[in-house]
Amino acid sequence: MTYLQESSRPAVTVPKLQAMRDAGEKIAMLTCYDASFSALLDRSGVDVLLIGDSLGNVLQGHTTTLPVSLDDIAYHTACVARAQPRALIMADLPFGTYGTPAEAFASSVKLMRAGAQMVKLEGGEWLAETIRFLVERAVPVCAHVGLTPQSVHAFGGFKVQGKTEAGAAQLLRDARAVEAAGAQVVLLEAVPTLIGSEVTHMLRVPTIGIGAGADCSGQVLVLHDMLGVFPGKRPRFVKDFMQGEPNIQAAVEAYVRAVKDGSFPGPEHSF
């Protein structure tokens, strides 16, 4: 059995994401951890596959993403890459692997050698030097601001960010700083819709939202969440796309359509 894709679909590249943003075409992104789903998601039209440290939750059973190692992410990145998807492959830098610019570069090199085409790291203003260091060394970067799950203990839980005047001002500073440092994509998690919209219109680079409103340049969900595979209470920003669909591919295609036509997220999935 082979998972190699034979597709005439043009490859999604970092410049392509910018072109999509500039043309007003929404970007559909999902997490992915293995070759089988890499092939299926690519067939279904997903633009970006994220090997997220969310694997610590949905695959390893941890309550936070903190235990996930760089080796874990590299292993799953290699699995996803073996299917040779046309979608862009983005990989998370786990907690504790980018404390200095040099450490971030070494970690990024390992993930890019495994097949990643872009790395994602969590943080705002304080990461500007690191982002600049990576971009100068040909490492494409997605900066993750707002609710950053690796900071769960500092936040005191998984809480919406930017609800206060001071918090909103900090989010705007973070977004400006990471773009100025060279981040090619900014991911916004769990922020009020108005803030997501303001950041999206303020920046030139694409924004990807998860609980950040419909105005973002694109959307991302954890694969297991959008397929209805989650224990306990469903996060507000999640929609179960398996409902009413005959199979997983149909559910993923429904997600892609909903992102592309702007019907997801709705107000019920936003803050």
From Swiss-Prot:
Which HAMAP family does this one have?
PanB
* GO BP term, example: pantothenate biosynthetic process
* Organism, scientific name: Burkholderia lata (strain ATCC 17760 / DSM 23089 / LMG 22485 / NCIMB 9086 / R18194 / 383)
The record's GO CC annotations read: cytoplasm
Q: Where in the cell is it found?
A: Cytoplasm
Q: Which residues are recorded as binding 3-methyl-2-oxobutanoate?
A: D53, S54, D92, K120
The cross-references to InterPro entries, in alphabetical order and at most eight, read: Pantoate_hydroxy_MeTrfase, Pyrv/PenolPyrv_kinase-like_dom, Pyrv_kinase-like_dom_sf
Q: What is its EC number?
A: 2.1.2.11
Which residue positions are annotated as catalytic?
E189
Q: Annotated pathway, please?
A: Cofactor biosynthesis; (R)-pantothenate biosynthesis; (R)-pantoate from 3-methyl-2-oxobutanoate: step 1/2
* Gene name of this polypeptide: panB2
Question: What's an example of a GO molecular-function annotation for this chain?
Answer: 3-methyl-2-oxobutanoate hydroxymethyltransferase activity
Q: Which family does it belong to?
A: Belongs to the PanB family.
Keywords, A to Z, come to: Cytoplasm, Magnesium, Metal-binding, Pantothenate biosynthesis, Transferase
Annotated Mg(2+) binding lies at D53, D92, E122
What is this enzyme's catalytic activity, as reactions?
A: 3-methyl-2-oxobutanoate + (6R)-5,10-methylene-5,6,7,8-tetrahydrofolate + H2O = 2-dehydropantoate + (6S)-5,6,7,8-tetrahydrofolate
PANTHER family, alphabetically? 3-METHYL-2-OXOBUTANOATE HYDROXYMETHYLTRANSFERASE
CDD domains hit by this protein = KPHMT-like (cd06557)
Q: How is the cofactor bound?
A: Binds 1 Mg(2+) ion per subunit.
Q: What quaternary arrangement does the UniProt entry report?
A: Homodecamer; pentamer of dimers.
* Role this protein plays: Catalyzes the reversible reaction in which hydroxymethyl group from 5,10-methylenetetrahydrofolate is transferred onto alpha-ketoisovalerate to form ketopantoate.
Give the protein's recorded name. 3-methyl-2-oxobutanoate hydroxymethyltransferase 2
The record's Gene3D superfamilies line, in alphabetical order, gives: Phosphoenolpyruvate-binding domains
Cofactor annotation: Mg(2+)
